[in-house]
């Protein structure tokens, strides 16, 4: 059977029709269900009523076990959510500098996942205030429309004590094993930081490598059979981002640091053209493909799983269309249509590489 669809714009006289041909008799094979990873900035919304409801719905809709990834799981604060911010207060220090661990808020987040029968993909970050090399200012100041001049502050800096940082990571994994069981936590993925080639990391690439070594070793010390990886860089189609990913893999190749999966991010770039939103699918696919090429160039790592821990039409979930007009794509059928095309394109790239 051959189906031919004709789509015409609203201004029929001014525009030429677009012809889309669909051959329903041609079988391409099973479409793998690899869209079971979801993420967000504000971890404290996880256990809010709507957060719990949404996570349960995602779990029920998916044929594969859903994974959830959230930012700010280790940051200092009272747990109050805000735009692109959250906190768990898992780590503070007493007057003598002795570590104090408090699992109350982190448990609330992870318990919500467990109750909904989803798995966390733990993004290990960001820096607790007591461990930051630049602790003040610490809480970001940002709202839609603002620049990010006062966003990447104390929580984005390297640790002032790598031994204390390593012990914190060890205690987090150890606590998870004690609470949820070795069998479950073995199946979790632990990702070191987020987008260290950008503002989320106020250190050098070499300092990130050091952070990765310390963090990955702590994860494996607590549970050798779980999975740790990174570097969660964004936009490998850009030369700077590509260089960061390459140097990280070169570092792991030389040092032998644990690396069970490789993660990076692919982003589109919508804009407004002639009064309508035009999506930037080519950029997201270019990021995806360049990352594939970089990983493939390392014989040691070319067979490792690649996880796109963020793959989106654009990069700011908190940026509404009221302030950022290109993001109006979210308010209609353009969004799901884009995602279907993006995932199909990424799967084709996977087959090619």
Predicted regions and their residues:
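Substrate-binding cleft/loops of secretory-pathway carbohydrate-active enzymes
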Residues: 233-263, 307, 311-334
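Non-catalytic accessory regions flanking glycosidase/transglycosidase catalytic cores in CAZymes
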Residues: 14-189, 205-235, 254-258, 297-303, ...
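Sec-dependent N-terminal signal peptides
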Residues: 2-12
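Catalytic-core region of carbohydrate-active enzymes that cleave or remodel glycosidic bonds
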Residues: 275-353
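Short, solvent-exposed loop/turn segments at secondary-structure boundaries
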Residues: 201-205, 274-279
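A short small-residue
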Residues: 138, 143-156, 195-196, 264-272, ...
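Non-cysteine beta-strand/loop elements that form the S-adenosyl-L-methionine
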Residues: 189-192, 261-265
